[in-house]
C-alpha cells in the first residue's frame, strides 16, 4: 500500500480497483488452472504459479503506473490460482503415509516465521527504495521456482481423466 500511495500515487478509487482486479483474476482463473494440477502435474502447477507470482511482483515494482499495477495484479492472481490447492494436494500425495495434520501445521508455522523475517527484511530494504522489496521478492519467487523444478519430488501423482474434471456439469 505504501508503494501504491507514495510511488505510484494511486487515489482511493484506484487502490480499490487494484484489490478488486486481483480478486477477480483469482476468481476467473481458479478452475482452469486447477485442471493443470489435476491432469498434468501438481509440481508443474506450483512452479508455473511461483514463476507468475514472481513476474507479477517484478512487474509491479518496476513500472510505477496504474495500468502496469493492474496488469501485475492479474499476473499475480493467475500465479496464485496455479498454486492454490496444488501445494496441499502435492503434500497429501507425497506424504500419504504420514500425519498430514502435523505436516500442515509445521508448514503454517514455517510460513509465519518466514513472514516475520520477510517483513523485517523488507522494512530494512525499503529504506533504500520502497519498490525494492517488491522487486527482490519477485526475483526470490523465480529462484524458488527454479529450486522447486530441480529438487521437488513428484512420485505419487496420478492424473485425473479430463472427463472427470467437468466442474460445470457437476454443478
Could you tell me what each predicted segment is?
Residues 1-14:
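Short amphipathic helix-loop junctions that connect adjacent transmembrane helices
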Residues 1-2, 18-37, 41-56, 68-126, ...:
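Substrate-agnostic recognition of the 12-TM MFS/MFS-like secondary transporter fold
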Residues 5-7, 35, 63:
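Short, hydrophobic transmembrane alpha-helix segments
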Residues 9, 41, 62-68:
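Helix-breaking motifs and short loop linkers at transmembrane-helix boundaries and internal kinks
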Residues 12, 66, 70, 167-171:
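Primarily residues marking transmembrane-helix entry/exit sites
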Residues 61-67, 127-132:
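Transmembrane helix interruption/hinge and helix-loop junction motifs
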Residues 132-150:
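Symmetry-related core transmembrane helices of the 12-TM Major Facilitator Superfamily/SLC fold
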Residues 151-171:
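Juxtamembrane intracellular "pre-TM" segments in multi-pass secondary transporters
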Amino acid at each position: 500500500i505504501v508503494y501504491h500511495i507514495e510511488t505510484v500515487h494511486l487515489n482511493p478509487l484506484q487502490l480499490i480497483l487494484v484489490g478488486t482486479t486481483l480478486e477477480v483474476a483469482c476468481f476467473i482463473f481458479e478452475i482452469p488452472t486447477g485442471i493443470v494440477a489435476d491432469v498434468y502435474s501438481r509440481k508443474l502447477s506450483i512452479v508455473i504459479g511461483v514463476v507468475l507470482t514472481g513476474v507479477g511482483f517484478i512487474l509491479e515494482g518496476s513500472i510505477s503506473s496504474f495500468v502496469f499495477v493492474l496488469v501485475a495484479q492479474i499476473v499475480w492472481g493467475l500465479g496464485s490460482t496455479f498454486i492454490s490447492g496444488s501445494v496441499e494436494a502435492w503434500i497429501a500425495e507425497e506424504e500419504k503415509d504420514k500425519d498430514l495434520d502435523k505436516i500442515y501445521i509445521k508448514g503454517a508455522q514455517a510460513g509465519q516465521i518466514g513472514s516475520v523475517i520477510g517483513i523485517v527484511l523488507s522494512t530494512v530494504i525499503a529504506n533504500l527504495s520502497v519498490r525494492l522489496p517488491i522487486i527482490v521478492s519477485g526475483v526470490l519467487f523465480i529462484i524458488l521456482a527454479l529450486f522447486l523444478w530441480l529438487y521437488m519430488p513428484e512420485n505419487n501423482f496420478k492424473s485425473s481423466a479430463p472427463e472427470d474434471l467437468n466442474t460445470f456439469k457437476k454443478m
